[in-house]
Structures are given as C-alpha cells and as structure tokens.
Regions:
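FIC/Doc superfamily catalytic core
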Residues: 1-180, 184-262
Length: 262
C-alpha cells in the first residue's frame, strides 16, 4: 500500500511509472505469445529506434512492430477508460482488440471468432462460437458487480480486487473470443480491473511464462484462485521494480522540500 500512497503524493512520478510499466507490459505480453522476436528487439521497435523501414528486415518483424505499438495505444486507451470507471463489456473488449490489430490485421480486428479454435500449449478447448457472447455477457455482469462495489482500497480489499482481476483475465483466456490475440486481451482486461481501483499494471514477465500458463490450466470459471495467487506474486515483483524510483523522489522531497512532483 506504500506505493499506492506515494503515487497519490507524487502524481508526476506516478505518471512516469505508469509510462514505464505500460511499455514493459506491452513488450512482455507480446513475448509471452511469440519468443521468436526477443524482448530486446521489441524494445527497439517500441521506441522506433534502429532502421526506419522494418520491412527491409522481414515482413514478420514489421508486423511485430505494428502490433506492439497497437498494444501500447490500446493500453493508453484503457487507462482513459479506467479514469472514467467504464464498465467492462463486450464492446469494450472488441475495441481493445480493434485498436491493437487494426493496422496489422484489419479484417479480423475487433471481430469475434466464427469458428472453433485450439489453444497452443494448453489442454483447454474453448467454447463453441455460438456461446461466446452469452458467456461473456453473463460473466461481465458478475465482474462489474464485484468491481464497482469496491468503495476504498485497503490491504483487505486489495486481495478481493486481485481476485476480480484474475476472474476477468481467466474469462477471456477461457472463452478465447477472437481468432488471435486472446492472451494479450486477457492480460490487458485483468489490468483494467487494477487500473479502475487505482493500482499499477501487473506485468507478467516472460521469465515466469511456464508458471503463468500452469496457473491458467488450474483455473475454472468458478475458481480463478490459482491465477490470483500467481498475479499476487507478479504484482509484488512489479512493485519492486518501481520502488527505487519512488524512493528517489521521496528522498528529494524530504531534502529539498516539495517540488514539481507535487
């Protein structure tokens, strides 16, 4: 809760931390899906460094660049929706997908799948396309009821919020509403729950991909506790990454008096 307090105390520092975590989130969420383009290259792509025309290297590398920037734009959009406390809906989920893939995959961006799919590396078989809208609508109603009943943030409510984030995250992974990009949408929707409640992004690092996938395998629509437990671990690691930054800001404030961070 200390970083939650410091974020409120130093809004400019919080904004900078959110930018850093957004970039980190975009990179690692993409690498979890495909390790062929390593995160060191995704960092180059995200910051538009290196050669200007990425297609000169390969079409796949250029596609990775487009999708990475699309995801970063989608996360920015989610932050604005979170500030308005917009309820989760199918239209929100479709807009998330559309913003991410509108340039790299225009014919499929924001479109719910119309055929059955299998998930690579997972034993779970997603529901038939005819059941997607009904499942999402029912589950989103339950998630919204729990999420927007949260009145304040406390150590006790934090774990409730984490469970809601896990429920939203697992739901999208379970239903697999799109032909592609479901993992990225699932992780982003879980983060949306955290953002609505004033928390930071929960960045799942690729180093823990196997642990993450195992936690998903152990979940069901009635019990997302295994994922919630994993998210607790990954969120603590995320906070550890930004703690030193806030300590620098706090130390300067104590030494020099309130500065621009106020």
């Amino acid at each position: 809760m200390r970083l939650h307090r410091l974020g409120g105390q130093y809004p400019l520092a919080r904004e900078e931390a959110m930018t850093a975590l957004r970039c980190l989130k975009a990179v690692h969420s993409n690498v979890i899906e495909d390790k062929r383009v390593d995160r060191i290259f995704l960092q180059v792509l995200l910051h538009s460094a290196g050669i200007e025309d990425k297609s000169g290297i390969s079409a796949e590398y250029e596609k990775a660049s487009i999708e990475l920037k699309g995801q970063e734009a989608m996360l920015r959009w989610l932050e604005s929706e979170a500030s308005r406390r917009t309820k989760i809906s199918i239209s929100m989920l479709r807009e998330m997908h559309r913003v991410t893939f509108e340039e790299s995959w225009p014919e499929g961006a924001g479109e719910l799948r119309k055929s059955e799919v299998r998930i690579r590396l997972m034993s779970h078989i997603p529901p038939h396309p005819s059941k997607i809208s009904q499942l999402l609508h029912q589950q989103f109603a339950s998630i919204n009821e729990r999420l927007f009943a949260q009145q304040s943030v406390s150590p006790d409510s934090f774990f409730e919020i984490l469970e809601i984030a896990a429920q939203a995250h697992y739901l999208v992974a379970h239903v697999h509403p799109f032909d592609d990009g479901n993992g990225r949408m699932a992780r982003a929707l879980g983060d949306y729950v955290m953002l609505v409640c004033g928390f930071y992004y929960d960045v799942i690092m690729t180093d823990y991909k196997d642990n993450y996938l195992d936690s998903l395998e152990e979940c069901s629509l009635l019990d997302a506790k295994p994922l919630s437990n994993f998210l607790e671990f990954s969120y603590q690691e995320t906070l550890d990454r930004i703690l030193g930054f806030f300590e620098i800001v706090e130390q300067q404030d104590m030494h020099n008096g309130p500065g621009l961070n106020r």
